[in-house]
C-alpha cells in the first residue's frame, strides 16, 4: 500500500483542491500520512499568486528533494508538484527543476492523482529523462457535490467551492491565466453539498471561489455579464438565489461569504443577506484601493465614490 504525504500551500481554494486529491487517494486505497519522511510519494500543492508565494512553493519543493536524498531509504520516493504554480509555469519549471521533480500535474488532474502515482511506480525512468508533465491546456475542471473529498479543516467548519476561474481583467492578477474563465457549479449541486455537510455536524459553511458574487451569471441565458454587472436574480440563478435556498435548509448552522467582488454588489444582494438569518452579517470584500487613478490602473471597474457609496448602502441595509 503506497503512502502519500501532501503539503498544501496557499489559499482556501487550493486547500479544497488538496482535500479532493486526498479523497481520491483514499478511494484508490492509498494511505495519506503527515510525515513526508515516511512517504513513498510527496505532493506539494503550490501557490503562485505573488512572488513570495512562488518562492515559498519552490522552497518546499527543494526541501523535500534534499531530504529524500539524505538516506538510501528515501531515494525511491517520488515528488509531484501540483497547484497553481505547476499549472502556470510547468514548462519553465521542467527545466529549472529538472532533477528535483518526478511529475507536474495541473488543476484538472486533482481527480486523477492516484492513477498518475501508480503510473510513476509502474515505469522505469532515468533521472536524465526529467519530470513528466500531465497538464493539458487551460483548466476547465469544477467539483461536484459528490466529488470524493477528505476535509482538512476542523470538524465545525468547511469550505465549499461554488465556482472556479475568473472573468475579471485585473492587471495585477494572473488567476484567470491559471484557473481559466469563471464557471459556476449548479445551484442544486452546491445546495446538496451544504445539506450533506450540515448533516455531518458542520456549523460554519464558507462559500468560496475566485469571485463568489459572479456565481450563476455565466449561466444566464441570452446574456453575457460584464465585469461590473450587478447580482440580479431576475436574470437567472445568482448568489442571491443560492443564499435563499441554503437559508431554507434545516439545521443549526450559518453561512459565511468569502472572496466577493465589490463591482457586483447590488441592493438585492444586500437585502438578501439582511433577510437570511443563516447568512453571517460579515463580508469578505477586497476593495484593493480607494484612489480612482489606482483603481483604473488596476482595472477594478470601480471608483472611490462607488466604494464609499457601497459601504454606506451595506451599513444601512444589513443590521448588525
What label would you give each PLM region?
Residues 76-83, 88-89, 93, 199-320:
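Conserved SAM/AdoMet-binding glycine-rich loop
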Residues 1-215, 268, 283, 306-316:
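Proteins enriched for Cys/Gly/acidic motifs involved in redox and nucleic-acid/cofactor modification
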